[in-house]
Amino acid sequence: MERIKKQLTELIGHTPLLELSRLGKAHQAQARIIAKLEYFNPGGSVKDRIALAMIEDAEERGILKPGAVIIEPTSGNTGVGLAWVAGVKGYKTILTMPETMSVERQNLLKAMGAKLVLTPGSKGMRGAIEKANELRDNTPGAVILQQFENPANPRTHIATTAQEIWEDTDGKVDVFIAGVGTGGTVSGVGEGLKQHNPHIEIIAVEPDSSAVLSGDKPGMHKIQGIGAGFIPKTYNPKVVDRVIRVADDDAIRTGRELSLKEGLLTGISAGAATFAALQVASQPEYAGKNIVVLLPDTGERYLSTALYAFEEYPL
């Protein structure tokens, strides 16, 4: 039987699950930690899912027309997804991004054909959003897909990511953990899983130094991709059972451990989510349970960051 795809978008999703047995053993985990490896998506991250979903939703609603320009504020991964999906579909992209994002991310976006506009790092994602709105107002035919507000974001995780996890664990999932950038992943997957079993615990992860979900003020942090500094409309607190705060150092060291113990080259936010999973898995009440943690992207986008500052963060 022929198995040839017609275009790259057909390869989005159906990413594998991997048990982190060596890492779990090293940390005396009493629960089973299972990673959802989202860097198996064509663009290298979970954000391919929402890029395709938001573009197709906008097409169906008549918002995106031939020759349109897509503008989007991004910390990197959504931009990569939008750039390549838009390219496949014939749209141009202009992306706004805090200047503090890794040089790998910046170069990757340019390589994908996007025009990149950097904003002050001190303003975080709010600064990127403000700049995107300004560019839209001055660019004929421009559309902002609004990943922080667009219901197509969590909706695609309900329909795809959650169902994949449920099916691939044969319904044996007790806890789901994910970092919060837009909040679409943890909210959508959480809602999708709870449709099958309302007792599944959903845990959100945020930077300790910018813990706005926990009621603190926004602040600077090193965990790129999560901790936008505000609570997005795509984050649904009713789905989330609790929030775990993770310090930069713990996220970075755990990210490095994933590489050394499991051979997984992942990003800093994957380290944060995995650190949270290890904390939960060490508690006696979770003994024998299955914890699924979503690892959003590949570490190749962070080689110039603190994640690989070996002298500053020795293991």
Regions found by a protein language model. Name each.
Residues 1-315:
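PLP-dependent amino-acid enzyme catalytic core
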